[in-house]
């Protein structure tokens, strides 16, 4: 029953409280996105500040198969480059899924306010980076990790101010009730 039930769906907005552990790039983005969808989200930060995540160290850029330069880029080519770059040790199903959603990830980052580099025409600029066959790396002038983290954190802060996300820092963890019940963990 639970294996086939889609927990994150509009019918469960009022029934489920979602707990997100971590306020790095993945945690802050997940909490902000779920808050924007209308879920009640409890976000636990294990650092002193949500902006102290190690995601800031990612500086090169993000690869996505947007094919802006009409050079034949595709989901399959991104998949192949990623698997080859990992010396064929990556789980191929996960890499393919990541390649499929790469365009949506870039669009989500732009919607969160990440200032990616742009061409004069207004399109997002991309460059060749690493061993990629085509130019597909979207970047923010050598500060990609910092800008991604600030974009996710600002989206999280907006949802905290709206009230859909409740943020718990290490100081506030002691105020939690001792007898909370977790129904399911995703």
Language model: regions and residue ranges:
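Single conserved hydrophobic/aromatic residue that forms the stacking wall/gate
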Residues: 175-178, 182-186
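Extreme N-terminal leader/targeting segments of oxidoreductases
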Residues: 1-18
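Catalytic-site beta-strand/loop segments enriched in glycine and acidic/polar residues
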Residues: 11, 23-24, 183
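Conserved N-terminal/central alpha/beta ligand/cofactor-binding core
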Residues: 5, 46-177
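Short glycine-/acidic-enriched loop or helix-start segments at secondary-structure transitions
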Residues: 30-31, 53-54, 185
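Short coil/turn connectors at secondary-structure junctions
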Residues: 13-16, 37-40, 59, 161-164
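N-terminal Rossmann-like FAD-binding beta1-loop-alpha1 element of flavoenzymes
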Residues: 18-43
């Amino acid at each position: 029953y639970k294996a086939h039930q889609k927990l994150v769906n509009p019918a469960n907005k009022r029934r489920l409280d979602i707990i997100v552990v971590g306020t790095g790039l993945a945690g802050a983005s997940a909490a902000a996105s779920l808050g924007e969808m209308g879920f009640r989200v409890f976000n636990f930060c294990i650092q002193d500040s949500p902006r102290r995540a190690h995601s800031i160290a990612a500086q090169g850029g993000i690869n996505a198969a947007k094919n802006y330069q009409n050079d034949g880029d595709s989901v399959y080519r991104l998949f192949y480059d990623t698997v080859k770059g990992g010396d064929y040790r990556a789980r191929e199903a996960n890499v393919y899924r990541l390649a499929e959603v790469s365009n949506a990830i870039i669009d989500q980052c732009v919607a969160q306010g990440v200032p990616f580099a742009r061409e004069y025409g207004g399109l997002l600029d991309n460059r060749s980076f690493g061993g990629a066959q085509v130019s597909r790396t979207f970047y923010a002038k050598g500060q990609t990790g910092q800008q991604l983290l600030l974009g996710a954190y600002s989206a999280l802060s907006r949802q905290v101010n709206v009230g859909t996300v409740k943020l718990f820092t290490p100081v506030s963890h002691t105020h939690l009730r001792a007898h909370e019940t977790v129904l399911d963990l995703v």
